[in-house]
């Protein structure tokens, strides 16, 4: 108190005030504080003080030639005294203004190209629509989101190589551009940025924005695609939200969305094939999304979704260590358990064998519309705290948690038999049986669970079996919270294994994913998905199956022809004919197949009846298991366009039309390709001409291996023998001539010899 009084008295004296405001500071410690080191101690003050001077800026001497000494108002722009300690000129801030208005202009053509992401953002905002603001409590949960719209999906290393190649092509250092996308982007950017005067560092920084996905762990309530995240600060606060529709889409969001749709279709299709894992890999490798190979996208894209992760696991890529159950992503946050097989009885006295997790564990559960914290002991739910968008979403989370807890009262709540099957008609495992049962109807489950009185805890309410909120009572252990549960933030990826039924396990043997977890939701992909695999032909309906089957036969006609004559059974078993069977009326499949196979056998036996067009037309029908019958058909029926359409055994029809003039085939009016050989002339002339230089020895001799096509003969050495398939579908044994002189006579003798060899 004394000191303060003393200070007050001092301040009353005018001399004190003068010392404090006018005199220079000359205390050594203070001078030292502000002058030692290169670091500016008070940047704001320094700036104000500098700008108050007449010439605070220094510039290169050349500036004198470019800028007049005075501007239009007659104010001086630079001083004739040079800067102390350097050979630069002292310049006024007014010179900057003059330069901005009258200085030289550079070409602006590169700006939209280099700053593409900014220009596009402005366009999106310009065309976006902002709706009303609503005030309400926001349940935000932290999710890993993409904060950088419009990027490609290169890894940091790949992008670095591209940037070095584009911006600093002459720098030393090994750069390996391997992936298709790397090469494409490099080529495109080099062309775009010719003669570019923007500083290379800036170009490099902007390129990085364009090439690499940047993610952040942010609190979000609502859309998570990058075009929503870029306006997150405008669309949601602590207690308000503003509705917003983006004014444009970006390719990276479209890739993510289309990838999920493709992966789901592929997993669903693979599940019903004989070898799901092999089929899945075949489909992933032959599918393109927006013109890019799906396997390349899977390697680069960090999207975490059940089907996508199954595809990644099949390719041997690492995936997140969290597991999926009932459409929720579970992450164990503490505790541990051991697994033990146990037999339990349902309320219907059906025995189920379940793998019980023994031990206390805590999990976070994150779904699309609800999140929860689950604490459980051995076959007992200790506590479940749920938050969700609506009653329905909250109920979904509660059902999944109750089933996951494996409590006895849940198993006893089963009414009726459990016999759910997957798409391949295989019974689901017991945990998924229970889940499906209660997802259909959870009334008994909630009624039998039991209720308890609850304490009043801030931000939490109880929930009754009829799903109404209550502050007094709640289903045992279950509470509803206003706060969401954050998604698991770690981006750590683990090595996993996958079995042929597409069950994905971590290295401890825990099942992380299985096809039962793949959503049935169908959507329309934003980018074109091209499934080249025959297994996916049926995705686009019966017409696509029909056209694709015939296109495939024509594309592979050379090898199909050989198999047709030598090993028809192997040909009939080709998976490319599988989808076609669903178009043939069930009752007729076996009879059609038997009839066509008999017809084909006659063609093989009787000389001169080999008819390429007819073989192509009827081949898919021969793939079904044949029934022996005496039935003859003049046409075969296929179910397309909602009704049965006829394919004529002899001649054209709207379904199958071969034009002799153009040699092209149209199926249902769609072009299915051209036949390279002429199917109507028995092709003897053509074949015998090709056989010049070969001696025909006689009938086929199996010791010389499978029949070669005419095209493959050229690889034979002189004197070497081989079986060869000739036009009528017959096989003969030939030897390549040792001398070239006698070639001329070959084509005449060949024709005679072929006839003899066959007869």
Swiss-Prot record:
Motif (Nuclear localization signal): 736-739
GO cellular component: host cell mitochondrion; host cell nucleus; virion component
Transmembrane spans: none
Residues the UniProt record annotates as site (Mammalian adaptation): 627
Family annotation (InterPro entries): Flu_PB2_2nd, Flu_PB2_6th, Flu_PB2_C, Flu_PB2_CAP-bd, Flu_PB2_middle, Flu_PB2_N, INV_PB2, PB2_helical
MF terms in GO: RNA binding; RNA-directed RNA polymerase activity
GO biological process, one term: symbiont-mediated suppression of host cytoplasmic pattern recognition receptor signaling pathway via inhibition of MAVS activity
Presence of the UniProt keyword tRNA-binding in the record: no
UniProtKB keywords: Cap snatching, Eukaryotic host gene expression shutoff by virus, Eukaryotic host transcription shutoff by virus, Host gene expression shutoff by virus, Host mitochondrion, Host nucleus, Host-virus interaction, Inhibition of host innate immune response by virus, Inhibition of host MAVS by virus, Inhibition of host RLR pathway by virus, Inhibition of host RNA polymerase II by virus, mRNA capping, mRNA processing, Viral immunoevasion, Viral transcription, Virion
UniProt subcellular location: Virion; Host nucleus; Host mitochondrion
Family: Belongs to the influenza viruses PB2 family.
Oligomeric form and interacting partners: Influenza RNA polymerase is composed of three subunits: PB1, PB2 and PA. Interacts (via N-terminus) with PB1 (via C-terminus). Interacts with nucleoprotein NP (via N-terminus). Interacts (via N-terminus) with host MAVS (via N-terminus); this interaction inhibits host innate immune response.
Function, as annotated: Plays an essential role in transcription initiation and cap-stealing mechanism, in which cellular capped pre-mRNAs are used to generate primers for viral transcription. Recognizes and binds the 7-methylguanosine-containing cap of the target pre-RNA which is subsequently cleaved after 10-13 nucleotides by the viral protein PA. Plays a role in the initiation of the viral genome replication and modulates the activity of the ribonucleoprotein (RNP) complex.
Protein name per UniProt: Polymerase basic protein 2
Organism in which the protein naturally occurs: Influenza A virus (strain A/Swine/Wisconsin/1/1961 H1N1)
């Amino acid at each position: 108190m004394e000191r303060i009084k003393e200070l007050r008295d001092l301040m009353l004296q005018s001399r004190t005030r003068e010392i404090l405001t006018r005199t220079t500071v000359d205390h050594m410690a203070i001078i030292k504080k502000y002058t030692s080191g290169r670091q500016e101690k008070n940047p704001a003050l320094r700036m104000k003080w500098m700008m108050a001077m007449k010439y605070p800026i220094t510039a290169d001497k050349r500036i004198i030639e470019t800028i007049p000494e005075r501007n239009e108002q007659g104010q001086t722009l630079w001083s004739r005294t040079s800067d102390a300690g350097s050979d630069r000129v002292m310049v006024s801030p007014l010179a900057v203004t003059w330069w901005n208005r009258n200085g030289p202009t550079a070409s602006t053509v590169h700006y939209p190209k280099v700053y593409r992401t900014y220009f596009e953002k402005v366009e999106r905002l310009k065309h976006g629509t902002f709706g009303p603001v609503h005030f309400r409590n926001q349940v935000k949960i932290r999710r890993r989101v993409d904060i950088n719209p419009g990027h490609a999906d290169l890894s940091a290393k790949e992008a670095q190589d591209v940037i070095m190649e584009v911006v600093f092509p002459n720098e030393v250092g090994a750069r390996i551009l391997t992936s298709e996308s790397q090469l494409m982007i490099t080529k495109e950017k080099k062309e775009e940025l010719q003669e570019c005067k923007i500083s290379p560092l800036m170009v490099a920084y902007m390129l990085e924005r364009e090439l690499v996905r940047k993610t952040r762990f942010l609190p979000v309530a609502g859309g998570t695609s990058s075009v929503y995240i870029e306006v997150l600060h405008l669309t949601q606060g602590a207690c308000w939200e503003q509705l917003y529709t983006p004014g444009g889409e970006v390719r990276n969001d479209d890739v993510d969305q289309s990838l999920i749709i493709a992966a789901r279709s592929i997993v669903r299709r693979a599940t019903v094939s004989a070898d799901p894992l092999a089929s899945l890999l075949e489909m992933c490798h032959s599918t393109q999304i927006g013109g890019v190979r799906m396997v390349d996208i899977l390697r680069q894209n960090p999207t975490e979704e059940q089907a996508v992760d199954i595809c990644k696991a099949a390719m041997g890529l690492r995936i997140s260590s969290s597991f999926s159950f009932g459409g929720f992503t579970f992450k164990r946050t503490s505790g541990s358990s051991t697994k033990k097989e146990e037999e339990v009885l349902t309320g219907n006295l059906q025995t189920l064998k379940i793998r019980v997790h023994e031990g206390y564990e805590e999990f976070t559960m994150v779904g699309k519309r609800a999140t929860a914290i689950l604490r459980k002991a051995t076959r007992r739910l200790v506590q479940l705290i749920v938050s969700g968008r609506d009653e329905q979403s909250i109920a979904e989370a509660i059902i999944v948690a109750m089933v996951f807890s494996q409590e006895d009262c849940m198993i006893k709540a089963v009414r009726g038999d459990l016999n759910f099957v997957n798409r391949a008609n295989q019974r689901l495992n017991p945990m998924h049986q229970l889940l499906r049962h209660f997802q259909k109807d959870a009334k008994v489950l909630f009624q039998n669970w039991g209720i308890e009185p609850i304490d009043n805890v801030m931000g939490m309410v109880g929930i009754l079996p009829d799903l109404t909120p209550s502050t007094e009572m709640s289903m045992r252990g279950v509470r509803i919270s206003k706060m969401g549960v954050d998604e698991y933030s770690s981006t750590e990826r683990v090595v996993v294994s996958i079995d042929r039924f597409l069950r994905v396990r971590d290295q401890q043997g825990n099942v992380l994913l299985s096809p039962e977890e793949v959503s049935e939701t169908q959507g329309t992909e934003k980018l074109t998905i091209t499934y080249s695999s025959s297994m996916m032909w049926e995705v686009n309906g019966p017409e696509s199956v029909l056209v694709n089957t015939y296109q495939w036969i024509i594309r592979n006609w050379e090898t199909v022809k050989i198999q047709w004559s030598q090993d028809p059974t192997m040909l009939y078993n080709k998976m490319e004919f599988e989808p076609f069977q669903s178009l043939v009326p069930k009752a007729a499949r076996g009879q059609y197949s038997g009839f066509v196979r008999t017809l084909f056998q006659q063609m093989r036996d009787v000389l001169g009846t080999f008819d390429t067009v007819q073989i192509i037309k009827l081949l898919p029908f021969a793939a079904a298991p044949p029934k022996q019958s005496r039935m003859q058909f003049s046409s075969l029926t296929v179910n397309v366009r909602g009704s049965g359409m006829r394919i004529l055994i002899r001649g054209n029809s709207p379904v199958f039309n071969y034009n002799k003039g153009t040699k092209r085939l149209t199926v249902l009016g769609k072009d299915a390709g051209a036949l390279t050989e002429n199917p109507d002339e028995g092709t003897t002339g053509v074949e015998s001409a090709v056989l010049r230089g070969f001696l025909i020895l006689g009938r086929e001799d199996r010791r010389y291996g499978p029949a070669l096509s005419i095209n493959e003969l050229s690889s034979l050495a002189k004197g070497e023998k081989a079986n060869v398939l000739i036009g009528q579908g017959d096989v003969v044994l030939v030897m390549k001539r040792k001398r070239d002189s006698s070639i001329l006579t070959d084509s005449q003798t060949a024709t005679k010899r072929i006839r003899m060899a066959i007869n």
